[in-house]
């Protein structure tokens, strides 16, 4: 369904996310395609991290240094600090029927750019009285991230409806080596420090998982979103 096929009564859905490695963006794109196919008017808003204390390390990918590029964020993240961001116009105001947040995990919890948005006046304007969902993209740690998004969104007047996680392959040590290798090289490698490592980033079946969850969200907007093909089975909440 094209934007020309959207009617004035189509459900309006907003995605707000941060994505430096483009993994959260890939999930957003996959879900947005499904929701548009179900007759929704979908807006996608990517938060930009502009804080002068950290932004220089996030201007390019891969990082100049896989560890020291992100290490300055450890203490601020553990203290749940906010930072300067640029908010797209779509996420500043609008009468949306559903808002969905995409949140990569940074040091166990919600990344600073999305946290900063969720604590903003703009988020309160968008969320007040509205249902919202969230998806977490992470190596392993997802639950604290999802709980924080839920807590912050609810505090801004939103009503949490569902959440899901997209995790990477591998155990604790090997998945960390894979991610750091990708941060530093910008490409998948089979070994790091002489150790065989699994692929990092989203698993090959993430698209099916995203489609199922998006269809579940579309079903929650019924009957207005009963356009196109509905989900065959519900997605499990994270």
Regions found by a protein language model. Name each.
Residues 167-238:
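Glycine-rich phosphate/pyrophosphate-binding loop and the adjoining helix
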């Amino acid at each position: 369904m094209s934007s020309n096929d959207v009617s004035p009564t189509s459900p309006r859905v907003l995605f707000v996310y941060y994505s430096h490695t483009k993994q959260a963006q890939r999930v957003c794109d996959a879900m947005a395609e499904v929701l548009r196919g179900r007759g929704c008017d979908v807006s996608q808003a990517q938060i930009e991290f502009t804080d002068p204390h950290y932004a220089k390390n996030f201007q390019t990918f891969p990082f100049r240094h896989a560890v020291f590029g992100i290490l300055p964020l450890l203490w601020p993240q553990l203290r749940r600090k906010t930072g300067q961001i640029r908010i797209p116009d779509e996420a500043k105001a609008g009468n949306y029927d559903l808002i969905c947040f995409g949140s990569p995990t940074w040091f166990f919890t919600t990344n600073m750019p999305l946290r900063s948005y969720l604590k903003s006046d703009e988020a309160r304007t968008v969320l007040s009285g509205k249902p919202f969902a969230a998806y977490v993209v992470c190596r392993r740690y997802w639950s604290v991230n999802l709980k924080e998004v839920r807590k912050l969104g609810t505090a801004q007047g939103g009503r949490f409806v569902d959440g899901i996680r997209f995790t990477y392959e591998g155990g604790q040590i090997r998945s960390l080596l894979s991610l750091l290798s990708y941060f530093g090289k910008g490409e998948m490698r089979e070994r790091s420090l002489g150790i065989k490592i699994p692929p990092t980033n989203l698993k090959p079946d993430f698209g099916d998982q995203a489609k199922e969850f998006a269809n579940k969200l579309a079903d929650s907007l019924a009957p207005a979103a009963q356009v196109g093909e509905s989900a065959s089975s519900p997605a499990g909440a994270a």
